[in-house]
């Protein structure tokens, strides 16, 4: 009998939360934080720590996201950067998104990104 009462109470609480406005929910969160000495910002801090970890990364993959309008120039740049033949470079550009280079140092990755973007490509460093 006690479990049924608790389930009904939980259902009532959920129904009230669904009907509450954003301001009321904000006040509820603040009240819960004060009452129980917790903070709702903890997951945000964990995400920020992950971002700092990524900033310290020392090797990157240079991904060609899109060749853009200047496909021929991008193919030439890919050939110059990778040493691939014309057919292979064209295949890589046509197959975008694709990694142009993997595991390169941050400075080299930025250079490659600049060359490819100058040629008209869209690049992502991962």
UniProtKB/Swiss-Prot annotation:
Gene Ontology cellular component terms for the protein in this record: cytosolic large ribosomal subunit
Pfam families named among the record's database cross-references: Ribosomal_L12 (PF00542), Ribosomal_L12_N (PF16320)
The UniProt record lists the keyword Ribonucleoprotein: yes
Entries under InterPro entries matching the protein: Ribosomal_bL12, Ribosomal_bL12_C, Ribosomal_bL12_C/ClpS-like, Ribosomal_bL12_oligo, Ribosomal_bL12_oligo_N_sf
GO terms, biological process: translation
Top-rank lineage group of the source organism: Bacteria
Keyword annotations: Ribonucleoprotein, Ribosomal protein
Keyword tRNA processing: no
Gene3D superfamilies attached to this UniProt entry: 3.30.1390.10, Single helix bin
GO molecular function (one): mRNA binding
Protein function: Forms part of the ribosomal stalk which helps the ribosome interact with GTP-bound translation factors. Is thus essential for accurate translation.
Subunit details: Homodimer. Part of the ribosomal stalk of the 50S ribosomal subunit. Forms a multimeric L10(L12)X complex, where L10 forms an elongated spine to which 2 to 4 L12 dimers bind in a sequential fashion. Binds GTP-bound translation factors.
Family to which this protein belongs: Belongs to the bacterial ribosomal protein bL12 family.
Protein name: Large ribosomal subunit protein bL12
């Amino acid at each position: 009998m006690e479990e049924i009462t608790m389930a009904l109470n939980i259902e009532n609480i959920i129904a009230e939360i669904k009907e509450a406005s954003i301001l009321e929910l904000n006040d509820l969160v603040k009240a819960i934080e004060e009452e129980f000495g917790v903070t709702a910002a903890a997951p945000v801090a964990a995400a920020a720590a992950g971002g700092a970890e990524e900033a310290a990364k020392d090797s990157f993959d240079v991904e060609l996201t899109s060749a853009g309008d200047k496909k021929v120039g991008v193919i030439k740049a890919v050939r110059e950067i990778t040493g691939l033949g014309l057919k292979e470079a064209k295949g890589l550009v046509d197959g975008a998104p694709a990694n142009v280079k993997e595991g390169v140092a941050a400075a080299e990755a930025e250079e490659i990104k600049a060359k490819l973007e100058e040629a008209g490509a869209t690049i992502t460093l991962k």
